[in-house]
Regions:
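ATP-dependent carboxylate activation and anion-phosphoryl transfer catalytic cores
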Residues: 12, 49-140
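Phosphate-binding site of ATP-dependent enzymes
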Residues: 1-53, 57-60, 81-88
């Protein structure tokens, strides 16, 4: 699973989490290795996580990771689930790629587009939070 988290200008202690994405592996694959990730001839896709309970769990762990690691702006959290339903953090990428060509979309692109505000909303969230952070620095 992937969860994109961005700063929330209204409350920097409560970041905004986008609808999570689940990687749909091509037949015969169980791991997102270099050929799956970068060979555009290997068919894979992402689908939006729609289960409310799983979404809440993914959001909770991703937002906590974002805060604990001191990320600002945005970060993409990579999380996996075992057969018992336990979630495991792989990483948080504080500068995950975005705005790839549609045929090469990465997980962050899908999550941004799951949100009705799309890229415009994504960048507005980041810019508004940056202004808040700058005002806080200036006041210190």
């Amino acid at each position: 699973y992937n969860v994109l988290v961005v700063d929330n200008a209204e409350n920097l202690n409560d970041p905004f989490a986008y609808p999570p994405a689940e990687l749909v592996f091509p037949p015969g694959e169980e791991f997102w290795h270099v050929d799956v990730k970068w060979n555009y001839n290997v068919p894979f896709d992402f689908k939006q996580v729609t289960d409310p309970e799983l979404t809440a769990r993914l959001h909770d762990i991703a937002k906590k990771l974002y805060q604990v690691m001191g990320v600002s702006g945005y970060g993409r959290c990579d999380i996996r689930m075992n057969e018992k339903g336990e979630l495991y953090i792989l990483e948080i990428n504080p500068n995950g790629g975005i705005m790839f060509k549609p045929e090469e979309y990465g997980p962050a692109d899908y999550m941004i587009l799951y949100d009705p505000e799309g890229y415009k909303g994504f960048f507005e969230r980041i810019f508004r939070a940056a202004v808040v952070r700058q005002k806080m620095r200036a006041a210190a």
